From Swiss-Prot:
Disulfide bonds: none annotated. GO terms for molecular function: ATP binding; proton-transporting ATP synthase activity, rotational mechanism; proton-transporting ATPase activity, rotational mechanism. GO terms for cellular component: proton-transporting two-sector ATPase complex, catalytic domain. InterPro entries: ATPase_E_C, ATPase_V1_Esu. CDD domains: ATP-synt_Fo_b. Keywords: ATP synthesis, Hydrogen ion transport, Ion transport, Transport. GO terms for biological process: proton motive force-driven plasma membrane ATP synthesis. The keyword Transport applies. This is V-type proton ATPase subunit E. It holds the Pfam family vATP-synt_E.
Amino acid sequence: MSNLENLTSKIIEDANKEAEKLLSEAKKEENKIVDEKIKKANKAKEQIIERAKRESRTKAERVISNAHLKVRNNKLEAKQEMINKVFDKAVIKLQNLSKDEYLNFVKSSILSLDIEGDEEIIVSPNDKDKIDISLMLTLNNQLKAKGKKALLKISNENRNIKGGFILYKNGIEINNSFEALVDSLRDELEQEIIEALFS
């Protein structure tokens, strides 16, 4: 299994663990948000229904239908907020990796990529101090052993990413930022999280 597959498996496993861990909290939060939105919508619906009865039966049916739609939309919006929180917490968990875990992530990710070996590594300002000369020597030595150029270097450019890194060369980027990795798994994991949170 490649390092990228290991990383992907770890991220999926961590996201699943995080989803389970947050399930109780998320369920309470979801119920609170949904209940508040439903109460507001029901209150508005009752006022609208009362007014509609005075105007006409046909109009009342249309208004009731719109009120139900609004309640449904509010509930969907509340669920989407909870799903977003799960993915945001996954990124935060990755941001809280220890220095060693972060360096291992960078090393294994870069060495699993098919690169030429003369790219620049762009990191967030918060991670600049984590990348040390030892890591760069290790990376370049291992790239050289694979027959690649051993000219990998840290870019002077900073990016507004939450963690991870971006490899850059000649206008081409390989985005391994934490948010990009979590987003790339979102389609795969979203249905599982929906089932875990709302079933």
